[in-house]
Swiss-Prot record:
Physiological role: The M protein has a crucial role in virus assembly and interacts with the RNP complex as well as with the viral membrane.
GO biological process, one term: virion assembly
Gene transcribed to yield this protein: M
Record protein name field: Matrix protein
Record field: transmembrane: none
Signal peptide: none
Source domain of life: Viruses
UniProt KW keywords: Viral envelope protein, Viral matrix protein, Virion
C-alpha cells in the first residue's frame, strides 16, 4: 500500500507554470516564428548566460520543384549552450537554418537531424547542429508514420523555447537512480498534477482524450533505507521529506520539465543517491513522451504535488523491457 503526503501550494506557486505559445499567422496562413523564455531557477548563478534551447517546427517536403507540403509537427532539442545573444536574435538565426530530417530505425523508429547552414550566434550549439543527432521518433515527432522515405524532408523551425539555467551548481537528471531497487527500502516518488489550457490550440483534444483539463505524471526521486534489516515507517519518511524543504518549478528541458530544489536538510543516503546534488531536473521527454508532446505549445501549471511512499520493488521482481518467446523444445516459454 502507498502512503500519500500533500505538499503545500507555496512549494510551487512562484514558478509552477509555463506560458503558452499561441499560434499567429501571416496573411498567407504561414505561422509567424515566436520565442518563449522560461526561468525555473532561483537566479543565484553568477553567470546568467547558460541556456537550454528547444526548437519546435514542421517536418515538410524539401522538393524545390513544388510547394512544401507539411507532414507533421516535430521538435529538436539543441541542449545547453552559453550565449549573451538576445532571444529574438537567436530566433532569427534558427529560422534560417536548413535542417534535414531523415527517418530511420534501430531498436525503435528514429529521426535523424542535421543542419547545412553556417552558424553564427548558434555556434555554442554547433556540435548537435553540424555533426547531426538521432532521437527516438516518438519523443520528437507527433506522427512519424506521416513522414515519407521517397521525398527529401526538412525541419522548418517556427517556435523556439529557451530555458535559462539560473540556479547555482549543477542540474542533475538522476537517470541512474530511476530503476534502483533495494530490499526493505521505502521508495520516494512524486505524483504531479498539471492543469492544461485547452484553449491554447482550438480543436485540439484535451489531455487523455476524455475532455479533461488535468493530467498527471509520476517521478521517482530515491529510496529511504535503514542500515538495519527493517524499513522506515511512513511517518518517519514524511518527516524527512518535510525537512528537505523542496521547491518545484516547470521548465522547458526536452519540451516540459519538472525542476526540484532542496533548500533544507537532506537524508545522507538520499543525497548520495542523487550524486550529492540538490537541484534535480526531470524532463517529461523521458518520463511521459505522450504528455510531453501534448504540452509542447500549451499553457500548463502545477495544481498539486504529492509525495507517494511505496515499498521499493523487490529485487526478485525482474523488470522486463520486452517479452521473449522461446520455443527451442516445442514449448513456448516467457523468459
Amino acid at each position: 500500500m502507498a502512503e500519500i503526503y500533500d505538499f503545500d501550494k507555496s512549494a510551487w506557486d512562484v514558478k509552477g507554470s509555463i506560458a503558452p505559445i499561441r499560434p499567429k499567422t501571416y496573411s498567407d496562413g504561414r505561422l509567424i516564428p515566436q520565442v518563449r523564455v522560461i526561468d525555473p531557477g532561483f537566479g543565484d548563478r553568477k553567470d546568467e548566460c547558460f541556456m537550454y534551447i528547444f526548437l519546435l517546427g514542421i517536418v515538410e517536403d524539401s522538393d524545390p520543384l513544388s510547394p512544401p507540403r507539411g507532414r507533421t509537427f516535430g521538435s529538436l532539442p539543441l541542449g545547453v549552450g552559453k550565449s549573451t545573444a538576445k532571444p529574438e536574435e537567436l530566433l532569427k538565426e534558427v529560422t534560417d537554418l536548413d535542417i534535414v530530417v531523415r527517418r530511420t530505425a534501430g531498436l525503435n523508429e528514429k529521426l535523424v537531424f542535421y543542419n547545412n547552414t553556417p552558424l553564427s550566434l548558434l555556434t555554442p550549439w554547433k556540435k548537435i547542429l553540424t555533426t547531426g543527432s538521432v532521437f527516438n521518433a516518438n519523443q520528437v515527432c507527433n506522427a512519424v508514420n506521416m513522414i515519407p522515405l521517397d521525398t527529401p524532408q526538412r525541419f522548418r523551425v517556427v517556435y523556439m523555447s529557451i530555458t535559462r539555467l539560473s540556479d547555482s551548481g549543477y542540474y542533475t537528471v538522476p537517470r541512474k537512480m530511476l530503476e534502483f531497487r533495494s530490499a526493505n527500502a521505502v521508495a520516494f516518488n512524486l505524483l504531479v498534477t498539471l492543469e492544461i489550457d485547452r484553449d491554447t490550440e482550438p480543436g485540439r483534444p484535451a489531455a487523455g482524450g476524455l475532455g479533461l483539463s488535468e493530467a498527471t505524471f509520476m517521478v521517482h526521486v530515491g529510496n529511504f533505507r535503514r542500515k538495519k534489516n527493517e524499513a522506515y515507517s511512513a511517518d518517519y519518511c514524511k518527516m524527512k521529506i518535510e525537512k528537505m524543504g523542496l521547491v518545484f518549478a516547470l521548465g522547458g528541458i526536452g519540451g516540459t520539465s519538472l525542476h526540484i530544489r532542496s533548500t533544507g536538510k537532506m537524508s545522507k543516503t538520499l543525497h548520495a543517491q542523487l550524486g550529492f546534488k540538490k537541484t534535480l531536473c526531470y524532463p517529461l521527454m523521458d518520463i511521459n513522451e505522450d504528455l510531453n508532446r501534448l504540452l509542447w505549445r500549451s499553457r500548463c501549471k502545477i495544481v498539486r504535488i504529492q509525495a507517494v511512499l511505496q515499498p521499493s520493488v523487490p529485487q526478485e521482481f525482474r523488470i522486463y523491457d520486452d517479452v521473449i518467446i522461446n520455443d527451442d523444445q516445442g514449448l513456448f516459454k516467457v523468459l
